[in-house]
């Protein structure tokens, strides 16, 4: 799921007050339980048990703060430090306004630079609760077989052109982010 908002990546020179939000599916989270898959790199998390240390994405489902209605969120470190207003760190609560409604997020993890830079990452269940008017899926991470990325992208763009599908290689997206970040 995808809620449009400010680009909070390093491509935006201004501080973001309403960053885009991505709701991560349960299958995305469980994918990283496997020891053999490539994983995102984490700068810092609130992980306390072994399962959450192995796969910090499970922190998005945490309910440890029963007295608090905040939504667990993961953000990349650069967005958290430089693009959000106010800046955030693990353990920080952020209050942001979406659709004239204040939403409180609790930062449970900070990612290193990744293709997810500039977005607030929450569980799909929390996304559906916060933004019930947003239906369908608009943001995809696709793992293609080695050497087949171009063919997979062409097939998806061809078959989903009426829906406006546009595949961008992760390497290209990261190059764009690093070009700005390293200036």
What residue spans do the PLM features occupy?
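Alpha-helical transmembrane segments of bacterial inner-membrane membrane proteins
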Residues: 1-183
């Amino acid at each position: 799921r995808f809620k449009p908002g400010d680009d909070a990546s390093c491509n935006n020179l201004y501080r973001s007050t309403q960053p885009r939000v991505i709701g991560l599916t349960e299958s995305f989270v469980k994918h990283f339980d496997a020891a053999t898959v490539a994983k995102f790199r984490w700068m810092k998390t609130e992980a306390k048990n072994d399962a959450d240390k192995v796969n910090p994405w499970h922190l998005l489902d945490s309910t440890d703060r029963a007295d608090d209605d905040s939504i667990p969120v993961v953000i990349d470190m650069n967005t958290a430090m430089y693009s959000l207003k106010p800046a955030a760190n693990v353990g920080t609560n952020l209050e942001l306004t979406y659709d004239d409604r204040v939403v409180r997020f609790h930062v449970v993890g900070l990612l290193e630079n990744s293709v997810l830079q500039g977005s607030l990452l929450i569980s799909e269940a929390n996304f559906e609760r916060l933004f019930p008017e947003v239906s369908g899926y608009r943001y995809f991470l696709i793992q293609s077989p080695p050497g087949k990325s171009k063919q997979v992208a062409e097939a998806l763009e061809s078959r989903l052109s009426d829906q406006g599908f546009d595949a961008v290689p992760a390497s290209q997206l990261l190059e764009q982010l690093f070009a700005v970040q390293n200036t």
